[in-house]
């Protein structure tokens, strides 16, 4: 308290501003951390939902097979044609592998189709499709994190995918979102928050200056 008394009125007002801005900064950091977590969770949930929706296409063609309308081979081929053409958020796609795991259909890397993909690993040594197959066998569905190149690029980037087993055909359908896209969106929000915070700081500093002058001048 004695320390505060030794401060001038102007210094006290600036101290209030500094404390207020520090608290605002701490609150902003907490909010940004929550935004980051929510953004990641939102992307993961969206991926889960679109995979579940795409799995409905497999169910539809399997229904045609069980009804005798199509042979299994014809039903599977038509289902693959439809799923291979599906896109969302511009370039995001679906692939299908089986439980061995062999690639059944990959729309952006056709050279994988029909091949054993159990040995494919990301730069960290993670056996991508083997882990997906194991997850599908044990839990039926789930999320897998790994690194994989974007379409048209050879550089692996962080990706989180959702995979789901379609048991009648022994297929695993999956789709994923690239984390760098999410990070770019997050940092866009960070910069927006920084500019807003800077604007608030400038306004508050101007107000403190005006208030300090209005108090000090009559006392001089």
Which sequence ranges carry the predicted segments?
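Membrane-interface helix-start motif
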Residues: 179-197
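Short, hydrophobic beta-strand elements of compact beta-sandwich sensory domains
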Residues: 158-183
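Amphipathic coiled-coil signal-relay and dimerization helices
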Residues: 28, 102-108, 156
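Short N-terminal helix-loop-first-beta-strand/juxtamembrane motif that initiates sensory/input modules
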Residues: 84-103, 140-143
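Cytoplasmic juxtamembrane amphipathic helix immediately C-terminal to a transmembrane segment
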Residues: 36, 41, 208-220
